Design a protein with these regions (language model features):
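Conserved N-terminal beta-strand and adjoining loop/helix that marks the start
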Residues: 2-35, 55, 86
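Conserved Nudix-box catalytic region and its N-terminal flanking loop in Nudix hydrolases
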Residues: 34-72
Length: 150
C-alpha cells in the first residue's frame, strides 16, 4: 500500500474565528478609595454593576476610549493611566477583548450622574462590592490584579 501524503485522513471542518471587539474598562477610585461603578442599562450585563467602559471606536486609542466612556456613562472627567489588566469575555457572536485602565478623576464635576448605557452610578466601598450584584468575576478579577484597596 503506498504511503499517503501528509495531511490525508479524516478532516474536521474549520471553525470560523469569532470577531474580536476591542473594549476598555475604567478603574476609578475616589479620594476615599471607593470604586466607581455603573449599573448597566443594556446587554451585556443589563442590571448588573460594573466599571464604566465600552467599545473602542475606530481611530481611538485605549486612553481616548476609556476617557470618553467614563464621561458618557457618568459625566465625570478622568485621565487615563496605565493598564491594570486584560480579559477576554465571550459574547453573542463576538469576543470582547477588554483592557482595564487605572484612571484618575480630573476636575469638576465630582459627583457622577448616570448617562448613556448606565441607569445608575455610584462609588462603592468594600462592603458595597460584597453586596452589589456585579458582573460575573468583576470583583475577584480586580482584587486579583491588586486594583482594589484592602
Amino acid at each position: 500500500m503506498p504511503a499517503s501524503p501528509a495531511g490525508d485522513g479524516p478532516r474536521t471542518p474549520a471553525v470560523p474565528a469569532l470577531p474580536v471587539q476591542a473594549c476598555v474598562g475604567a478603574v476609578v477610585l475616589d479620594d476615599a478609595g471607593r470604586l466607581l461603578l455603573v449599573r448597566r442599562r443594556n446587554a451585556p450585563g443589563r442590571g448588573l454593576w460594573s466599571v464604566p467602559g465600552g467599545r473602542v471606536e475606530p481611530g481611538e486609542s485605549l486612553a481616548e476610549a476609556v476617557e470618553r466612556e467614563v464621561h458618557e456613562e457618568t459625566g465625570l472627567v478622568v485621565r487615563a493611566g496605565e493598564p491594570v489588566g486584560r480579559i477576554t469575555i465571550p459574547g453573542n457572536g463576538v469576543v470582547y477583548d477588554v483592557v482595564d485602565l487605572v484612571c484618575t478623576l480630573s476636575g469638576a464635576p465630582t459627583e457622577p450622574v448616570p448617562g448613556d448605557d448606565a441607569d445608575a452610578v455610584t462609588f462603592a466601598d468594600a462592603a458595597d462590592l460584597d453586596r452589589l450584584a456585579c458582573t460575573p468575576g468583576l470583583v475577584a478579577t480586580l482584587r486579583g490584579w491588586g486594583a482594589l484597596p484592602g
